[in-house]
Structures are given as C-alpha cells and as structure tokens.
Amino acid sequence: DGTYLEDQDKFRTSGIFRDVYLLSRPRQALFDYAVTTSLVPGGGARSGAAPVVRSGAAPERAVIEVRGVFRAGPVPTTVRLADRQGAVVATGQLEPFTPGDDDPGIGTGYTHRVRLAVGDPHLWSAEDPYLYHLTITTPGEVITDRVGLREVEVTGAVVRLNGRPLTLRGVNRHDSDPATGPAIGLEHMRRDLRLMKEHNINAVRSSHYPNDPRFYQLCDEYGFYVMSEADNESHGTQTRFLADDSWDNQVEHWNEPIADNPEWTDATVDRMQLCVHREKNRPSVIAWSAGNECSYGCTLEAALRWVKDFDPTRLTHYESSYYRDSKRRYDYSCIDLYSRMYPAIEEIRDYLDSDPDKPFILVEYCHAMGNGPGDLEDYWEIIRADERMCGGFVWEWCDHAVAAGTSPDGRPVHLYGGDHGEAVHDGNFCVDGLVSPDRVPHPGLAELKNVQRPARVVDYDQDEGLLTIRNDLDHTDLAHYARISYEVLRDGVVVAHEELDLVEPVPPHTSIMLRCAPDVPATGRCHLLVIYRLAQDQPLLAADHVLGFDEVPLRNADGRTRRVAALADHPSRAGRVTVRREGTRIDVG
C-alpha cells in the first residue's frame, strides 16, 4: 500500500490537486525524448564521443545530445537549437544508434539520437539562467522545449557547475497554501520564487515529492538549482510493522520493515523512476534525491542504482543512508553527496578532516520554527571556508496552516494540527517556516538573506582608507552584478554617503581593494555601512534591489553614543517614553 510510503510532515489532503489533461497525438510520433548537455574544454570532442553535427566554423565548446524513442516505428525527425533571439545555432536529424557498455549518456530504451555542437555557448547557471529554444519536428507534430547548457559533476569531493565550485543557498519547500492546500497556482509559485530571489536563495529541495511540472520550468527560467526528490517517506510507518515498537527494538530493526525488505523494492524504484522521467530534461535539476527519512537498505540501493544507470549526468542524494548496526554494510557507491540533517559544527569539521571522497551537503539545517533559525553565520563560516561544503537547504520555506478567516481586529487566523478536532496530528510542528502561511517573511528570513549576501567586507584599514571586499558569487563578476555604496552612521543617523567605483573585474571567489576614506565625526558612535545593490534588472528583481550589507565600526576620539549621553544628562522621572519606527510602536512605561 503506497500509504506506507507517504508519511511526509504536512497536512494530508485528498482529491485532485494538480492539473489532469488528455492529449491527442499522432500514432507515429516521438514517444519520449531526453536532453543532456556537456562542456568540451579546448574545442576537442571527448574520447569515445559519437560523431558531432557541427554548427558552422565556430569552435566546439558545448554539446547537446537529444535521444528519442518512437511509438510505432521511426519517422524523420529534425532537431533544431536556437538562441534567445531566435537565431539557429545548431540543427540535425535523429539517427538510429545502439548504446554501448561505456555509453555515458542518459536513459535506457532510446533508439535514436543526435549530437549538436554549439560554438561559443552561453552557459546556464542560477546567476545567469540563459535558455536556448529546442524544436523537435516530425511529420505530424512539433515539440518545443527550453534547454540550459550546463554540466554538473563532482571532482575532488567538490560539486562543480560548468567547472566552477557550486554553493547551494537553499530552502526546503512544500506545496502549501492556507486557502488551497497543496493545489498551487502559477502565480503562487512565482511569488515564492520572487521572495526567494529577494533573499539571496538560489536552490530548492522539492521536499518530499516531485513538485508541479511548471515549478521546475520556472526554476529553469528564473535561475534556481533544484534537488528533485522522489515521493518516498516512511519514517513513521516503519514501526507499524513491528510487534514490539519499543525504542530499543526500533533501533535494532530500524530498516527491516520497509527499507531493507525486498517486497518494497518495486514500489520504491517505481517512485524514483516517476520522479526522474518527468523532470529529466530540466536544466535546473542538478540532483536526484531518493526520498526522505526512509531508513536504508536493499530498496533504496536498487532505486539509486537505477538512477545512476539511467542518468549519470546528475548527482544523487539520500540522507538516511547511515546504518544503526555496525556489523551491517550497505552499498553507498550510487550516492554522490554525503548528507546530514542538523549536524553540529564539530561533526562537520570531523568529516572534512577525514579526507572524504564525497561533498558534504546540509540537506536540512537551521530549523526555522519559533525564533529560529539559529547559528546561520556559524554554518556559513565553514561553508565559505571549504569548497567540499556545497551549501544546504534551510528547513523550511513556509509555515503550514489552514486559513480560517480573520480575528475581530482584522488579523488573519490560521489553524494548525489539533485545531480541527483530529486525534492524530503534529501540533504546531509544521509551523516551522521562514515565511508565514500567506508568505509574510519572518525575521529569520532577513537574517538568512544577509548571511547569504553575494559579497562581504573581509577587511577595512581605516588608517589607509582601504576597504577589501570579496565576491562570494560562483559564476559572475561582482562588478557586473552589483553596485556598492557606503554610508557613515553617527549614533544610527546617516551623516555621509558615497558610491564606490568597481572599475576592475572582480571574478568569483576573489577580492578587491577599494578606496574608502570618509570623514569620520569626532564624536558619537560611528559605523561604516557598506550596501550591495543589484546593478541591473533580472527576471524577478529590479535594479537597485538591496542584496545585503556589512557594518564596520569606525574609530574616533570619542566613541560614545551621544544620544544616550544626552538622555543621561537630562533624566526623565515621569510620563512615558514612546519609540516609533516605520509603523512599529513600542511603549516603555
């Protein structure tokens, strides 16, 4: 029963919550196609590569491969790739082929393929999500899609995209709306992604099931890395099979009921296949996850082996692949990422000190419930310091709750577990997001935004007037991406401001020294506020959007907050002190 494999922490609702449609197609049509892209450094084809259809005299830098299988016999099929302006950059015909044992491409069962070389390619990344237009034409049908030229791999325990180390600034996201539940509209998806972009988030884990297909297409367009997760979670239902459900017995037989039970292998593999087949052509998907909190054993081993055989072009992930009994050993060769939830910093350091062969990913960290998330800067210090840390996904994006009208004073009312009279529920444990159910940001999201800012001050020599700023982007020149200005604050009041000129390139993960020698007031507590703003419009963000800031103390002869000193010189022993700021009122009696 699939119910045992769907124990995700969320409101569980019934009914049809995604679009269902019927599609009429020609009998002789392309049944399925798979698109992969790879980069060829230096202009030479990789060893063992199939013949390449070249696009003019331009040097080969990227290759797009399209594989297909037909419904009722092959028909002439033309594949064309055009750039954003509509100019055709490569074209060719699907031809029969037989995959060899050393075939590095995607899929099983494909009978035809074409390889197209693209000279001087515009590569896809979350920082620059450039998409080409793919057209597949048969006598009775035209299929269109969008393609991002990119390559993801692990070398030296470092995740790389297009040859450069990759950092995932991600969140775990459920489909959840206070009014419509898991039925999510297109504008709802755009709103989520816009909020994420505004807060320097570049990655999404589809926890814990495949999302609406349109969501992945938006991630392609707007620039997000996606870990696409299979609909597979059994962490609570495992114990239902145990006659003795005591904790000691659960530990002893932690994975036997489902994860290490061959009777569940077909169901587990099927869910993995459904996830991969549907999103195999999405450039935003850089990793497949076999599920969440299902324990580990023969079922997950089989699912992950299938993924690596079918799609060696992406990474594989599964967090619950540890074992309770030290006598047992399982197959981890099909897992590319070492994944942990909520580890202590020391656990991360111990792993990195062990000379690992897999990158470390925080698949869930900094639980955002209540006054969380906490320790964000501590985690990001170690992420920034070691390329083998490829980032992580904060748990989680939004609070889960059900809209229940408004209170007498007009505020929205949301219900959570137990408010409906149900006997079995999670209480408020699904109210654990960075935003409210109706997408109002919580304070923790503002902190996350600044921790993940694209640049930061690493040194300021006040005597020499030299400010050193590091570019924390993975693929983009900071001078192209951001404008930098500063303000001098005296007791919190701006007394001077100026733009800083980025006249030289600042490549990813490098630093630049800028002249910054403002006049510092002789009295008061003073700070240098360095502000990063978006240099030009992006699909979801307007130019001048504030990306983050640094605040650096400034020395002067006094250093005391004069406003506090003035209050001390004129104490008030009666009445009330009222502080107002941007509509927020605090009364101190």
Question: Each predicted region: which residue ranges?
Answer:
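Substrate-binding/catalytic cleft of secreted carbohydrate-active enzymes
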Residues: 193-196, 203-434
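Secreted/periplasmic carbohydrate-active enzymes, especially glycoside hydrolases
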Residues: 1-218, 222-226, 271-272, 286-287, ...
